[in-house]
């Protein structure tokens, strides 16, 4: 049971943490138009919307959903031109992930909010302002669909908004949630 809670938290981290920006939203010389996501960040639970509807649709259990709703996470991100490495921590859990930012499709078996990501593609938006991560997922009930995470700098680079949209193949209406990550001081 505890492992399920940790997997759900890992999904929470994957969804929001990846969006974090460096303290000043500076760019690296080899990425003149892209935000630098490197830095230390803290999830602002008060400013974020509930992940409960999204996690419920995926099939996450009650305890997983409640644990994710009340756990304050911290994350450290390290970005290069092609890779974003995430190390997230919370009470009793650790999550590490590497995202390839060049648009390639990466086969995966990561647990995201109770679903399994079958493959992941991460790339910058056309305007180079948003990091867009698309996961082809399978829920615990065997349904397939797409979980899209769009991250944008807000508050002059002092926070990142991560908007998550879940669209299951067999369901007409998408479900969404939003996380706000604040620069750690």
Each model region followed by its residue ranges:
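Hydrophobic small-molecule pocket/channel-lining residues, especially in calycin-type beta-barrels
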Residues: 26-185
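Sec/Tat signal peptide C-region and signal peptidase I cleavage site
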Residues: 20-25
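Hydrophobic helical h-region of N-terminal Sec-dependent signal peptides
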Residues: 10-18
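Bacterial N-terminal signal peptides that target proteins for export
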Residues: 1-10
């Amino acid at each position: 049971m505890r492992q399920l809670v940790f997997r759900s938290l890992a999904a929470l981290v994957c969804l929001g943490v990846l969006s974090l920006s460096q303290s000043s939203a500076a760019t690296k010389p080899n990425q003149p138009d892209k935000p630098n996501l490197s830095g230390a960040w803290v999830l602002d639970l008060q400013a974020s919307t509930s992940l409960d509807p999204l996690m419920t649709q995926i099939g996450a259990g009650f305890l997983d959903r409640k644990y994710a709703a009340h756990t304050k996470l911290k994350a450290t991100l390290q970005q290069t031109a092609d890779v974003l490495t995430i190390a997230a921590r919370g009470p009793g859990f650790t999550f590490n992930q590497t995202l390839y930012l060049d648009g390639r499709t990466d086969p995966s078996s990561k647990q995201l909010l109770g679903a399994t990501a079958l493959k992941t593609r991460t790339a910058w938006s056309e305007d180079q302002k948003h990091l867009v991560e698309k996961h082809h997922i399978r829920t615990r009930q065997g349904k397939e669909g797409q979980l899209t995470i769009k991250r944008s700098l807000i508050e002059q680079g002092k926070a990142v908004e991560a908007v998550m949209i879940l669209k299951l193949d067999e369901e007409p209406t998408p479900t969404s949630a939003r996380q706000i990550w604040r620069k750690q001081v």
